[in-house]
Amino acid sequence: MKVRASVKKICNNCKIIKRHGVVRVICKEPRHKQRQG
């Protein structure tokens, strides 16, 4: 899980979703998981 100021899609499988006001990237590649902080 990377915590970043700006989250971006890294590959085509990445999806940007918003959970409880937190922007997240979910992907089948575990290294691509991100969260905005």
Swiss-Prot record:
A biological process term (GO) from this entry: translation
Alphabetical keyword list: Ribonucleoprotein, Ribosomal protein
One of the Pfam families matching this protein, by short name: Ribosomal_L36
UniProt KW Transmembrane keyword: no
Keyword Metal-binding assigned: no
Gene Ontology MF: a single term: structural constituent of ribosome
Alphabetized PROSITE patterns for the sequence: RIBOSOMAL_L36
A GO cellular component entry from the record: ribosome
Chain segments annotated as coiled-coil in the UniProt record: none
HAMAP family the UniProt entry points to: Ribosomal_bL36
Annotated family: Belongs to the bacterial ribosomal protein bL36 family.
Protein name according to UniProt: Large ribosomal subunit protein bL36
Organism annotation: Ruthia magnifica subsp. Calyptogena magnifica
GN (gene name): rpmJ
